[in-house]
């Protein structure tokens, strides 16, 4: 409901991000027209297109997209995404999928950098064409930067200050936290603690201190207990 977005924009001074279904470019057009600061092409919503994502280069509003591995990340960047995030498994309070996705992206980057530094250009071309399915120019940019060419945030299952610090130490540029805060016993205190842990991710003493007396955490869900067809992170290509 656009009215809800207008109400939120009027109530806060921080940037407002709204979700559009994967491939639903008209939803994205509407969100851009009402002035959201960023659009999340999100697997949390039922996809509108099972084959194609939104051509994000056709918009002026920046997009964030989820990725489980380097191929998904680079394909979204090639489409125009300004930010990447792990897909995680939203609403579970279980960080295991976000960790898995970040490790996969890091391992993919390490392979690209390794091939490039060893002069194995033929392997890079094959990787770009057959595995990652992106133009060679993006691969070379990753090899040069030794990271993604856009910021990469963690999302999905982050519920504690230690979770946030874990993802930052793994190389994330920041974190998204939703239900891990709002479904906890004391959202305001937990939110502040997660912010502190994100800023001070390499200071375990401080993380331990801000983790005290946060109230009841969101109840975590074991990923193995979720039926295969209900997993959100598998949506998108």
Swiss-Prot record:
One of its GO terms (molecular function) is pyridoxal 5'-phosphate synthase (glutamine hydrolysing) activity. Its EC number is 4.3.3.6. D-ribose 5-phosphate binds at residues 91, 157, 178-179. It is an enzyme of class 4 (lyase). Keywords: Lyase, Pyridoxal phosphate, Schiff base. It holds the Pfam family SOR_SNZ. The keyword Lyase applies. D-glyceraldehyde 3-phosphate binds at residue 103. It catalyses: aldehydo-D-ribose 5-phosphate + D-glyceraldehyde 3-phosphate + L-glutamine = pyridoxal 5'-phosphate + L-glutamate + phosphate + 3 H2O + H(+). The active site is at residue 19. Pathway: Cofactor biosynthesis; pyridoxal 5'-phosphate biosynthesis. GO terms for biological process: amino acid metabolic process; pyridoxal phosphate biosynthetic process; pyridoxine biosynthetic process. SUPFAM superfamilies: Ribulose-phoshate binding barrel (SSF51366). Belongs to the PdxS/SNZ family. In the presence of PdxT, forms a dodecamer of heterodimers. Catalyzes the formation of pyridoxal 5'-phosphate from ribose 5-phosphate (RBP), glyceraldehyde 3-phosphate (G3P) and ammonia. The ammonia is provided by the PdxT subunit. Can also use ribulose 5-phosphate and dihydroxyacetone phosphate as substrates, resulting from enzyme-catalyzed isomerization of RBP and G3P, respectively. This is Pyridoxal 5'-phosphate synthase subunit PdxS.
């Amino acid at each position: 409901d656009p009215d809800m977005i207008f109400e939120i924009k009027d109530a806060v001074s921080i940037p407002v991000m709204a979700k559009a279904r994967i491939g639903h470019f008209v939803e994205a057009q509407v969100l851009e027209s009402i002035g959201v600061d960023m659009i999340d092409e999100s697997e949390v919503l039922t996809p509108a297109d099972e084959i194609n994502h939104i051509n994000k280069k056709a918009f002026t509003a920046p997009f964030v997209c989820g990725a489980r591995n380097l191929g998904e990340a680079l394909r979204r960047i090639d489409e125009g995404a300004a930010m990447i995030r792990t897909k995680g498994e939203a609403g579970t309070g279980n960080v295991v999928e976000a960790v898995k996705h970040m490790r996969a992206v890091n391992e993919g980057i390490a392979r690209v950098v390794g091939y490039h530094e060893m002069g194995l250009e033929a392997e890079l071309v094959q990787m770009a064409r057959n595995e990652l399915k992106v133009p060679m120019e993006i691969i070379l940019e990753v090899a040069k930067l030794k990271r993604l060419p856009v910021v990469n945030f963690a999302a999905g299952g982050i519920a504690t200050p230690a979770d946030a610090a874990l993802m930052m130490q793994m190389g994330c540029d920041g974190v998204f936290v939703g239900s891990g805060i709002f479904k906890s016993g004391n959202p305001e205190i937990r939110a502040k603690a997660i912010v502190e842990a994100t800023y001070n991710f390499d200071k375990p003493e401080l993380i331990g201190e801000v983790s005290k007396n946060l109230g009841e955490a969101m109840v975590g869900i074991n990923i193995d207990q979720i039926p295969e067809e209900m997993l959100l992170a598998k949506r998108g290509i």
